[in-house]
Amino acid sequence: MVTSAGVGHAEYNNGADVQHADYAHLTSVGQVEQKPLGGRLGALAEYYKPNVASMEEYRAMHAQSITDPAAFYGERARTYVDWFRPFDAVFLPGPDGRPSFDNNAWFVNGQLNACYNLVDRHAARTPDKVAIIYEADEPGEGYSLTYRELLAQVCKVAQVLQYSMGVRKGDTVAVYMPMIPQALVTLLAISRIGAIHSVVFAGFSSNSLRDRINDARSEVVVTTDESKRGGKIIETKRIVDDAIKETPQLRKVLVYKRTCNPSVSYVADRDLDWDTEVKKYKSYCPCEPVDSEHPLFLLYTSGSTGAPKGVQHSTAGYLLQAYLSMLYSFDVHSDDIFFTAGDIGWITGHTYVVYGPLFSGCTTVVFEGTPAYPSYSRYWDIIDKYSVTQFYVAPTALRLLKRAGDSYVDGYSLRTLRSLGTVGEPIAAEVWEWYYTVIGKREIPVIDTYWQTESGAHLVTPLAGGSTPMKPGSASFPFFGIDLAILDPQTGEELLGPNVEGVLAVKQPWPSFTRTIWNNHDRYLDTYLNPYKGYYFAGDGAARDSQGFIWILGRVDDVVNVSGHRLSTAEVEAAIIQESMVAECAVVGFADELTGQAIAAFVVLKQKSSWNTASERELQEIKKHLILSVRRDIGPFAAPKLIVLVDDLPKTRSGKIMRRILRKILAGEADQLGDVSTLSNPGIVKHLIESVKF
């Protein structure tokens, strides 16, 4: 069992402030009454008929997705997915006839190809429709690709991978690229030939990249010479070169020249130039049929034990659930312009920059830059310039833009928007209100989504189009296929009814649920399925209020969420402890106004007396050195915001570090520590409290 650490410290609004978005209001507990659409949505209502029209329809669909998943998913898989060979069964049933975590497989014996469903069929039906709008870091440097052009580029790169680099069906290919169209082309080319892509966020250090390449056993890497972000140059090729010094299986590197910097070094017979290679091949090659359960990609995510986990997703189940979330969560139609301000190095970019939008046949916006460059108006400029219909972004960016001021929004109409999404972390009520009021003009619904790398698509979310009500800060209701439960963290018993708080779990698998951890199925079981037998344990605390709304309360394991990025505290601790001056270290998360959570490291040095007598300047140099160690080992985004040098750490008599005490002190709750007399060193608590200075 896991403990309830972290649960119960978040505030949630139990029953008030239900928002109408000018389309629905709550009349009693659990009941929603519809009223006519108003404002901009009302003007579009006839043209954009909602994919889910009412709360009643949502309830009926959700019930079917849980009680009769064969009918719910079977009908949609036959309707929306193009198959090379039809499936024999929707899922492999467990002993009770329902989907089972013990043998989770969907669309049994079916064959398909992800790239065909994302590109080929649209290139055949709507070849001149824009598939990708590229907004480069520097305004005015972007361009667009139609589905016809995208197909040609994908086929050429697929042949480069096959014939110039020797990639075969089932091989893993590492991808370390910025947010440019060639990154999407690469992912599609890999899936076209039946290989498996393993994208590593291009902000990770060479050490982190090395570890992921080795764990995935990738023999090929695709990267760029450099990348540009926020007006700055990032040396991606140099990072790759450093990483593969310790990847003995690595054979080839494909390099797209983003900046064409002549000083970037290349290794003969290993490094291939993108432009030179694609010229060798024709603009079409056939797709490789793969089984429904064939791995589509690996995506590494932080775990509480420190070593990153290669979360493996299947092809058919992931594609269908990703598309259904586009269809229902965002009410997407095929002529929409979908803008996710996320990176393909994370699951948000996989599902809502690449697979969801392109499967839907709509247009996806690929943004290379940051929300603040060259000004805080950058997002709003993109939305107006390209007539964006759905916008999806992390609360961290919204906090930054809210702080910058409403003047940066002035002058932008944002009139084409039909839904505003948030992703990666819970959104504070005041930020939700700003987003809804200043950006949405109190007419556009805020789709506050909760999901994970492991889930592949949404777990809890409102639905755009008018069917479900909203409440600031709540993720609302379970998505289709999600049989959600809130469990008592100690007993594992389900807490039924309203006004309950515990750990979030799911009772049965859904099509896009991860199948395993690459090369480590035992860890998969221990992390997700063994903590509470019969359930998927999501690792987050949750509450259900009096009206049935779900509130996400944050992690209950040793994972910190910084700007929507999950980081293992153990991984950060390892980066600090490797320094010869460090004896012990404990890393915890604490609340941060901008990033949601930030990282604090409590560090015990080997020479305790030396830092007690050191000058303030010397202490700052020690702290800078430790922060640099984390930046170098993991990446800049993982750098601790606070380093606290201490004489000792709070420990039980068995030697376990009590991180709960550190979290309480950082939260200003030193008066709520409870009985500390059982610590092996209770006197250290006063020292810790006095040492924390923001």
UniProtKB/Swiss-Prot annotation:
GO terms for molecular function: acetate-CoA ligase activity; acid-ammonia (or amide) ligase activity; AMP binding; ATP binding. It catalyses: acetate + ATP + CoA = acetyl-CoA + AMP + diphosphate. CoA binds at residues 229-232, 348, 563, 631. Pfam families: ACAS_N, AMP-binding, AMP-binding_C. GO terms for cellular component: cytosol; endoplasmic reticulum. A motif (Microbody targeting signal) lies at residues 692-694. ATP binds at residues 424-426, 448-453, 540, 555, 566. Its EC number is 6.2.1.1. It is found in: Microsome; Endoplasmic reticulum. It is an enzyme of class 6 (ligase). Its main location: other. Keywords: ATP-binding, Endoplasmic reticulum, Ligase, Microsome, Nucleotide-binding. GO terms for biological process: acetate fermentation; acetyl-CoA biosynthetic process; acetyl-CoA biosynthetic process from acetate. PANTHER family: ACETYL-COENZYME A SYNTHETASE, ACETYL-COENZYME A SYNTHETASE 1. Belongs to the ATP-dependent AMP-binding enzyme family. NCBIfam families: Ac_CoA_lig_AcsA (TIGR02188), PRK00174.1 (NF001208). This is Acetyl-coenzyme A synthetase 1. It comes from Eremothecium gossypii (strain ATCC 10895 / CBS 109.51 / FGSC 9923 / NRRL Y-1056) (Yeast).
